Curated annotation (Swiss-Prot):
It comes from the Eukaryota. Functions as ATP-binding component of the Arp2/3 complex which is involved in regulation of actin polymerization and together with an activating nucleation-promoting factor (NPF) mediates the formation of branched actin networks. Seems to contact the pointed end of the daughter actin filament. Regulates the directionality of cell expansion by regulating the actin organization, and thus the microtubules distribution and the fusion of small vacuoles. The keyword Nucleotide-binding applies. This is Actin-related protein 3.
Amino acid sequence: MDAASRPAVVIDNGTGYTKMGFAGNVEPCFITPTVVAVNDTFAGQTRANTTKGNWMAQHSAGVMADLDFFIGEDALARSRSSNTYNLSYPIHNGQVENWDTMERFWQQCIFNYLRCDPEDHYFLLTESPLTPPETREYTGEIMFETFNVPGLYIACQPVLALAAGYTTTKCEMTGVVVDVGDGATHIVPVADGYVIGSSIRSIPITGKDVTQFIQQLLKERGEHIPPEESFDVARRVKEMYCYTCSDIVKEFNKHDREPNKYIKHWSGIKPKTGAKYTCDIGYERFLGPEIFFHPEIYNNDFTTPLHVVIDKCIQSSPIDTRRALYKNIVLSGGSTMFKDFHRRLQRDLKKIVDARVLASNARLGGDAKAQPIEVNVVSHPIQRYAVWFGGSVLASTAEFYEACHTKAEYEEYGASICRTNPVFKGMY
């Protein structure tokens, strides 16, 4: 059976989580933390045997070290239950930093999770914007040399998110993608499927920062949460209880007037003693997401709100694309799922745009009148997995297999072919 007749494998590697599955599905088959636990016992034996000159023992220890590792939730569980396993995070701020660990991670994803033969499927992998071309070469080498895949396409995450966020029968591949990940936040303008690289903006406020801010607030308030559980509790509070408010002062007053209505209660069990503990969740519910709109409450070194960064991103784009960009601002990532996040972002951004139009009309003095600009922030139910879903849809088209780099091309031209990946018009 030809590999092109089988569904392609779609893997979206993020800093915090990896989404994996097969093209044509609505949701990924597996979502797992991007982390690897490696047994340091065998690594220590390898070093000791090298010193003693015992090469056979060194080889055996090296083989065991290559086999004894876990990924995802299994890795986190192993690190908690045993001191011999150390955690390694291969991706930092959206970029791969440890290729050996990344290869191990992919190995487990393909064989233990998806349980497929990589030689029988084309692969679509994702990358963050501004990824250097050398990274694509390393990815191509691993995929073609180690896993012997028949075809590979490396897609830019914002383009896939834009493909997932279309709201009409025609997929508009012009828009701005606000991608808030666990380790990186990018604002990326895209015109006709091509990223406008010179206008990309990044901010040092991510989903992990929201979690850490909630963790900090709970600690300062004196809630009795076990230290080893505090980050995980803060993450769950973020996902379950947080929302975006329209006015932070009014929200404080509402909580003070009716605490029983707005305060939530969290209960858990201490892992060491088994005793129960409880804590109250109050201001943290709206203060967590607020750092995107008032970052100074969390980080004194960065004080530019998200909507201002988006406006600067669009204003630095070619003038003939700006109206289309304002009209299609697509959210992507789990930390954009807060209730009313898209409404708050659209309101604050529209204030800036309307003020600019009024100032332009005042300068013209009535001789001409600037046309109003439509601002639209797109929110949809699958924006948490928007990048993966966009990859799933695009990898389901016939054009995908034509755009992939094949193993034969890799053997003829080398890894340099992976430096560029053509934009294909599969949906528009």
